[in-house]
Amino acid sequence: MAERTHACGKVTVEAVGQTVQLKGWVQKRRDLGGLIFIDLRDRTGIVQVVFNPETSKEALEVAETIRSEYVLHVEGTVVERGEGAINDNMATGRIEVQATKVSVLNAAKTTPIIIADDTDASEDVRLKYRYLDLRRPVMFNTFKMRHDVTKTIRNFLDTEEFLEVETPILTKSTPEGARDYLVPSRVHDGEFYALPQSPQLFKQLLMVGGFERYYQVARCFRDEDLRADRQPEFTQIDIEASFLTQDEILDMMERMMTKVMKDAKGVEVSAPFPRMKYADAMARYGSDKPDTRFEMELTDLSEFAAGCGFKVFTSAVESGGQVKAINAKGAASKYSRKDIDALTEFVKVYGAKGLAWLKVEEDGLKGPIAKFFGEEDASVLKNTLEATAGDLLLFVADKKSVVADSLGALRLRLGKELELIDESKFNFLWVTDWPLLEYDEDADRYFAAHHPFTMPFREDVELLETAPEKARAQAYDLVLNGYELGGGSLRIYERDVQEKMFKALGFSQEEAQEQFGFLLEAFEYGTPPHGGIALGLDRLVMLLAGRTNLRDTIAFPKTASASCLLTEAPSPVAEAQLEELNLKLNVKEEK
């Protein structure tokens, strides 16, 4: 078999007159009665191959048997297309290959999906036949983007003198965070490994070990409920460094991300990135990962609401809640009563009891609650919300968390429906100064907002024992266009501070020692100040490639129920395997 001389998508007018050897798949076959045209595809693109009896009767005879997705080896001569046949929409559109020889390297059945960017196959079918789905150019381009992103990050971190170090996949189960995937040990009867949710503790121990600068393209595993931007196994760019301040870490990540954007996406973004405190993000956008590509911020009306004539507003404030509003500029005429009812049902998903609304007209406010506001109150409302005729005002009165969640989600929905979002923009943002702990009323205990190893502000360390809910974390999240790309923090590196953190989280001394004794002991041997960040590679590629689903950025992903339609994993195992592990199944029967 002759060696391939050209990739299909790279045969250009410079090759006219040359004999070429091409290998690839049949994208399309057209029989024009005496002439057969085949679009031959490989990962670089498509080239048109012509089978003409005047050039080779033998090649034409073979071409008559060829169907879509056959794998071919074609030998032929490159010629220029005639004036009427030029296609400037494709890189090879000015030439074609006159076939002199063709051999079928492999035949193909009729494929269950169309191998094209605009395939009509359902996602389940695409996942079941993932190896066919991956042939689509849009999929290859996505994974080329992923490769370019990873390569750029590796090159950047190499210039910054980071070492790439692999950490264990079989590790210890810890109680914090999502559920672990457990792996039974055959050697240690009744004991289990866990697959890592992140390399957090190992990368900190590498700092104890004096490595100073570490990174890893790390596989991570979390047994949690899934959604469009989550997978049970995912990849993160894991970074840790000693002796750097928070500002130094953020500056380095900005330099890295601007290089990624330029080298992998061809987009210039400016640094430094804007920074916003967590409290400000929640107050202004109702989100800890605000999409800053459009305005429409939340306005706090609690002070006004406390003294207004609308009881729903006043009672919300009196019970410790708040009233906030969104002004959808110029949207009054775009939303009917039925449309607003749909918005009301939407915010109820986020816990809101309802959605109050007003339309601003030239002669005043109109809507179901307009009668509760006198002329003076109406004027205050309009001035506070900077409202003018044609605006739609939307209000939620409830607990602070419900107001933030519901209006934050409503803001994003309105931004999309009103086409306020500039899809060409890439808006990076740092969200800083997070709460260290969050209180869970159902569990009646505190949980770490990020993880238990996050360093509090020095002046807040004592609050861990007196008022844990007031302690602030030296933590930072990187946000891009309303998506959390990753999070990081400075880490606790002193045993006494770590023990205070564990105590605030409800650990007894015995529990802390049992779970994390190795880390606490390590802190007694001269641990340097350190910090880092973990960036979600899958999500970053999803955003840069313009995809809407994480599954499109992972070669062989799982479904929303964490199953693989291709291999049918998870699956039962042989009884002998269970016996070897001394395991017995106790599967509950479905009623």
Swiss-Prot record:
Gene3D superfamilies in the record: Bira Bifunctional Protein, Domain 2 (3.30.930.10), GAD-like domain (3.30.1360.30), Nucleic acid-binding proteins (2.40.50.140)
The record's principal subcellular location, in a coarse class, is cytoplasm
Mind listing the GO molecular function terms for this protein?
aspartate-tRNA ligase activity; aspartate-tRNA(Asn) ligase activity; ATP binding; catalytic activity, acting on a protein; nucleic acid binding; transferase activity
Task: List, alphabetically, the GO terms of the cellular component aspect.
Answer: cytoplasm
Q: Where does L-aspartate bind?
A: E176, R222, H450, R491
Q: Which InterPro entries match?
A: Aa-tRNA-synt_II (IPR004364), aa-tRNA-synth_II (IPR006195), aa-tRNA-synth_II/BPL/LPL (IPR045864), Asp-tRNA-ligase_1 (IPR004524), Asp-tRNA-ligase_1_N (IPR047089), Asp/Asn-tRNA-synth_IIb (IPR002312), AspRS_core (IPR047090), GAD-like_sf (IPR004115)
> Which segments carry the region annotation Aspartate?
200-203
Catalysed transformations (reactions):
tRNA(Asx) + L-aspartate + ATP = L-aspartyl-tRNA(Asx) + AMP + diphosphate
As for what it does, the entry says: Aspartyl-tRNA synthetase with relaxed tRNA specificity since it is able to aspartylate not only its cognate tRNA(Asp) but also tRNA(Asn). Reaction proceeds in two steps: L-aspartate is first activated by ATP to form Asp-AMP and then transferred to the acceptor end of tRNA(Asp/Asn).
Q: Quote the protein name from its UniProt record.
A: Aspartate--tRNA(Asp/Asn) ligase
